[in-house]
Amino acid sequence: MATILVLHGPNLNLLGTREPGVYGTITLPQINQDLEQRARDAGHHLMYLQSNAEYELIDRIHAARGEGVDFILINPAAFTHTSVAIRDALMGVSIPFIEVHLSNVHKREPFRHHSYFSDVAVGVICGLGASGYRLALEAALEQLAASAKP
């Protein structure tokens, strides 16, 4: 059984009401419940955290190593474009991760085109709405299964 941690960055607690034309109408609790059920059905454990505070996400990443977390799915949200500290935390714990974005950041303002995470992530999924989280979970489970084979 693998343990997967899902991290949601700033303002994602507003999903469902914040700019639904960009982010959709699904709420964060709905996304979390869906992922948790899919992980459980596959025989794995999933944990999640949403925070608007950079230090809380960093502390959670640090704790993940000691907890034996096997994979991280992260939507850094606005921290994507600003947080060297979260990048360093992810690199410091050496837990593979997939970067997820609900919107296609490359179709948006130029300042959203740069990510401090993409070049060190296993992969990046953007622009597919809440489906991106499901696809990221599927990819993580495939990666974990492949790494478990002798």
Swiss-Prot record:
Enzyme superclass (EC): lyase
Keywords: Amino-acid biosynthesis, Aromatic amino acid biosynthesis, Lyase
Pathway assigned to this chain's UniProt record: Metabolic intermediate biosynthesis; chorismate biosynthesis; chorismate from D-erythrose 4-phosphate and phosphoenolpyruvate: step 3/7
Catalytic residues in the record: Y23, H101
Keyword Acetylation: no
Annotated positions binding substrate: N75, H81, D88, L102, S103, R112
EC number(s) from the headed UniProt entry: 4.2.1.10
Protein name: 3-dehydroquinate dehydratase
GO MF entries: 3-dehydroquinate dehydratase activity
Site entry (Transition state stabilizer), positions: R18
CDD domains recorded: DHQase_II
Catalytic activity: 3-dehydroquinate = 3-dehydroshikimate + H2O
Pfam families the UniProt entry points to: DHquinase_II
GO biological process, one term: quinate catabolic process
Lineage: Bacteria, Pseudomonadati, Pseudomonadota, Gammaproteobacteria, Pseudomonadales
SUPFAM superfamilies membership: Type II 3-dehydroquinate dehydratase (SSF52304)
Function comment: Catalyzes a trans-dehydration via an enolate intermediate.
